[in-house]
Amino acid sequence: MGLGLLASRALRSSRIIRNSTRTIVSTPELKNADAAAAAAAADAPSDLPKRHPVGGARVHLPNPEDVIEVFVDGYPVKIPKGMTVLQACEIAGVDIPRFCYHSRLSIAGNCRMCLVEVEKSPKPVASCAMPALPGMKIKTDTPIAKKAREGVMEFLLMNHPLDCPICDQGGECDLQDQSMAFGSDRGRFTEMKRSVVDKNLGPLVKTVMTRCIQCTRCVRFASEVAGVEDLGMLGRGSGEEIGTYVEKLMTSELSGNVIDICPVGALTSKPFAFKARNWELKGTESIDVTDAVGSNIRIDSRGPEVMRVVPRLNEDINEEWISDKTRFFYDGLKRQRLNDPMIRGADGRFQAVSWRDALAIVAEVMHQIKPEEIVGVAGKLSDAESMMALKDLLNKMGSNNIFCEGNGMHPNADLRSGYIMNTSISGLEKADAFLLVGTQPRVEAAMVNARIHKTVKATNAKVGYVGPAADFNYDHEHLGTDPQTLVEIAEGRHPFSSALKNAKNPVIIVGAGVFDRDDKDAVFAAVDTIAKNNNVVRPDWNGLNVLLLNAAQVAALDLGLVPESDKCIESAKFVYLMGADDVNLDKLPDDAFVVYQGHHGDRGVYRANVILPASAFTEKEGIYENTEGCAQITLPAVPTVGDARDDWKIVRALSEVAGVGLPYDSLGAIRSRIKTVAPNLLEVDERQPATFSTSLRPEVSQKVSATPFTPAVENFYMTDAITRASKIMAQCSALLKK
């Protein structure tokens, strides 16, 4: 009975298709764009209401000769040649259902959910894989298209389990939404559903492979974006499944993005499993501060707790991807937090005190110390407002010894072009040759590395690397381990010199680890010579870049956080650590008084005499500037912990107690102060390029040493106080060392 019903429905469907189709358009008609467009325009309805592109779809028409016109449900649409039918529909404001198609991945065309009707085509076509042709008439809402999608959805649901009540994808599942919109209200499949063994991809991605619909998004992402060939399609027919050929973990710093691109609940977040539903969460737009890229994120919270972090679209910085560290560090926000002001007693133990008492002790000690013996250090996660306040406080106390950890004692702070990415992150896609000097972008700035990988994959750009042995996910030449290689390239004696010379848009990226070298000036002089000899810096192109490591470095240099003496730590008697946990205090005198202002009980606490609890970046509003010189703002997603306060408010209160009150008591006032020092920091979400070239840098007589470059980041998953407190990051770190 079931087979008879199925056969009769198939016959009726084929009869409908035969009766509704016409003869296939001939090749000459397709080639004559003007005739096709004119014929289609004659049939187009007039006075159509205006439509808007779907999902932020954008169309750029630089050359009128490369433009064709198609008709989507009667609406004329101008699109560039080479676009697919699906892209034309998006520009026309029509949302086409899809599972396998993703705008940043190659076209697979295997889910068939995007079927539409094209006039004079004998059957529905897969719009994601069909090129749009001049004058093409596309119909997206006809009975044939609806019937085709309903049939495809029925096939997809045949083996899909009824897990929605216990599936973490519930509420934000493409299969749920599209089955509701395009599926039937009943199914005819009565056989046993298949089941698939789950795969172990590591501590971050949870797999329930029985839910998989074989869209291959994860496979294509791993290969094309992450640059690892860990996933693939195995078997065929009903035995087809996605997994690893040999049992192994997914070894990529971008692996968590498969959670976002999976249209069903096959790949979900393992730390977030069974924690909350998406409609229970409050989303707050913010940025990531665990590296210097400033990836755009959305912080999802419930009550006082951050539940998860997901990416936010920004074409110029992170596109729609984020690193695993960015996505999963959040559990560190609730561990090892500092809740109350504390002072170290005579027995070496900390005891909680009031804010008034803590600030009074700090102010009293500051007045007893000579100004030149007072040192301030801004940490990796410091915002611009707090660094401005700390600098003003120390200046009023007579000290100019303040710096940001990671910048060293002698950063290239004279010219802004000497410490930012002049090419910009998105501009890397225009490069055709890369020279990486002492930097490993894969662990220092994963999203910058993703751009380089994207460029190398698309254009076969050549990559030369000078530094210690490293694991890159794209083809590269390891040129050497020490700066002597740079001298050879500068003099044209190295084979890679020809690659830079022949490149149209060469790029040089210098790692921030060079700042800590004794021969820093000589290294940068060699890099400047390479740039000059190979036309790296031109009026229309600046390919000379410095890749910084943490979120505070660029803003600190813009604000002038440069120490007056390179021996300030050795002679200091009072050190103010504002979230600085990785600064080297080995040479600090034993009798020095140390104040630690921060949000985690990390390395800086062990040397502290007074602890002042501060807010984390998820609990305050602050300006951060990324490595390309773009200022962005974090917004508070959850309330502060315990008796903690914002960093700049603590410094402001301390100045009042010390009798040198700072002239601002609000964010607006302190930003007005910032405007007088670094106005570019107030141009939020607008990249401010450097005005002057590094060619203005003075000549140096220093010679490069034979000391090899060293890795700037030893452990990708643990780089700051928050990530070191994260249990998830600890699990990833343990697997990394195996």
Swiss-Prot record:
The Swiss-Prot or TrEMBL record lists the needed cofactor(s) as: [2Fe-2S] cluster; [4Fe-4S] cluster
Q: How is the cofactor bound?
A: Binds 1 [2Fe-2S] cluster per subunit.
Q: Keyword check for Transferase, yes or no.
A: no
Q: What does this protein do?
A: Core subunit of the mitochondrial membrane respiratory chain NADH dehydrogenase (Complex I) that is believed to belong to the minimal assembly required for catalysis. Complex I functions in the transfer of electrons from NADH to the respiratory chain. The immediate electron acceptor for the enzyme is believed to be ubiquinone. This is the largest subunit of complex I and it is a component of the iron-sulfur (IP) fragment of the enzyme. It may form part of the active site crevice where NADH is oxidized.
Q: Pfam families, per this entry?
A: Fer2_4, Fer4_NDSU1, Fer4_Nqo3, Molybdopterin, NADH-G_4Fe-4S_3, NADH_dhqG_C
Q: Which cysteines are joined by disulfide bonds?
A: none
Q: Which Gene3D superfamilies match?
A: 3.10.20.740, 3.30.70.20, 3.40.50.740, Dimethylsulfoxide Reductase, domain 2
Name the family the entry cites. Belongs to the complex I 75 kDa subunit family.
> What is the name listed in the Swiss-Prot or TrEMBL entry for this protein?
NADH dehydrogenase [ubiquinone] iron-sulfur protein 1, mitochondrial
**Residue span(s) of domain 4Fe-4S His(Cys)3-ligated-type:** 144-183
* Biological process annotations from GO: ATP synthesis coupled electron transport
Amino acids binding [4Fe-4S] cluster 2: 212, 215, 218, 262
Name its cellular compartments: Mitochondrion inner membrane
Binding-site residues for [4Fe-4S] cluster 1, renumbered to this chain: 160, 164, 167, 173
Give every 2Fe-2S ferredoxin-type domain span: 66-144
Q: State the superkingdom.
A: Eukaryota
* Keyword Oxidoreductase listed: yes
Supply the NCBIfam families for this chain.
NuoG
The Enzyme Commission number assigned here is: 7.1.1.2
**SUPFAM superfamilies annotated for this entry?**
2Fe-2S ferredoxin-like, 4Fe-4S ferredoxins, Formate dehydrogenase/DMSO reductase, domains 1-3
Kindly state which reaction or reactions the protein catalyses.
a ubiquinone + NADH + 5 H(+)(in) = a ubiquinol + NAD(+) + 4 H(+)(out)
